[in-house]
Structures are given as C-alpha cells and as structure tokens.
C-alpha cells in the first residue's frame, strides 16, 4: 500500500479534490461458504460466497445505495459502510483504499472478500482455473453501470 499511501498523502498536501477512490480488490472467486471478520455479520450477509461487497467509509457511504442498486442489476451486491476509517474492523483496511480513508477522502473497496472466501488467496494454487469467470464478467458489467453513473 506504499503507492496508495504516497498518492493519498500527496493529494491531501496539494489540497486536491477527489470524488471517489475505487480499489478493486479480488473480484472473481465464489464459493459455497463465506467467512466474516465478525460472526454477527453472518446474520446480515450471506452464508454463501457468491456476492460482491462494496466497502466504503462514511462519506463514500452516501453513494452506496445508488452504486449497489446499479451493480445489483448484474451481480448480487452487499454493502458495508464503515465509520472511523474502518478502525473497528481492521480486516476492511487491508487494501489500497485505506490510506485514502486516513486522508479524509471518499474511498470504496470492491471485493469478493478475498481471503475470507478464497482458500487460494496468495497461494500457488491461485490460478485462473480457480476463478469464476462468469461471476467476474457480471462484476465488470456491474462496475461499468455503477461507476458510469457517478
């Protein structure tokens, strides 16, 4: 995350405005099971790992309903708005969006939940044949619809 941290810091120092930073973090794995950083999340979200998650800080959270609605036309979409730059749920900070949260920018992580779902994550077995390319195609179509409307 060194590059995203450097960029977010530079943008803040230059007082640059940014509508939304989007981090695409693992987008193509589905599974019959899904894990969560907190067990209570299972009651709100699905037991099956066949959805894409939109994880956003408070400012970007205002965009979540529209983004989720547009993406949801293509792929099952779940939202997770996180206050306080996600500090209460450290696992949601493990990607390039978090330095933007720290600098006060609106940022969104789009994810299939990576290691919470995919046993191949950062393993030699993480190959194209382990991915669900139909799901990935629907994610891309959903991103096109959602982000194109911003």
Across the structure, where does each feature detected by a protein language model lie?
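Solvent-exposed, polar/charged alpha-helical surfaces in well-ordered, non-transmembrane soluble domains
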Residues: 5, 9, 65, 69, ...
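An extended, acidic, His-containing surface patch that forms the Zn2+-binding/catalytic region
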Residues: 91, 98-100
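His/Asp/Glu-rich mid-to-C-terminal helical/loop segments that flank catalytic regions of hydrolases
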Residues: 116-150
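Sec-exported extracytoplasmic/periplasmic mature domains
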Residues: 9-16, 68-76, 101-105, 144-149
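Acidic/histidine-rich catalytic neighborhood of metal-dependent amide-processing enzymes
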Residues: 1-59, 65, 89-92
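Flexible glycine/proline-enriched surface loops and loop-helix/loop-strand junctions
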Residues: 46-54, 82-85, 123-128
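Short catalytic/ligand-gating loop segments at beta-alpha or beta-beta junctions
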Residues: 74-93
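Structural recognition of the beta-strand scaffold that forms the well-ordered cores
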Residues: 19-25, 101, 106-111
């Amino acid at each position: 995350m060194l590059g995203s941290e450097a960029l977010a810091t530079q943008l803040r120092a230059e007082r640059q405005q940014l509508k939304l930073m989007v981090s695409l973090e693992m987008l193509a794995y589905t599974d019959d099971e899904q894990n969560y950083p907190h067990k209570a999340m299972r009651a709100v979200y699905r037991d099956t790992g066949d959805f894409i998650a939109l994880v956003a800080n408070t400012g970007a959270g205002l965009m979540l309903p529209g983004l989720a609605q547009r993406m949801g036309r293509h792929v099952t979409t779940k939202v997770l708005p996180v206050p306080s730059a996600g500090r209460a749920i450290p696992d949601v900070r493990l990607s390039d969006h978090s330095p933007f949260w720290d600098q006060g920018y609106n940022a969104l992580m789009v994810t299939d939940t990576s290691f919470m779902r995919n046993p191949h994550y950062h393993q030699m077995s993480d190959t194209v044949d382990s991915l669900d390319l139909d799901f990935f195609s629907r994610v891309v179509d959903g991103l096109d619809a959602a982000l194109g409307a911003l």
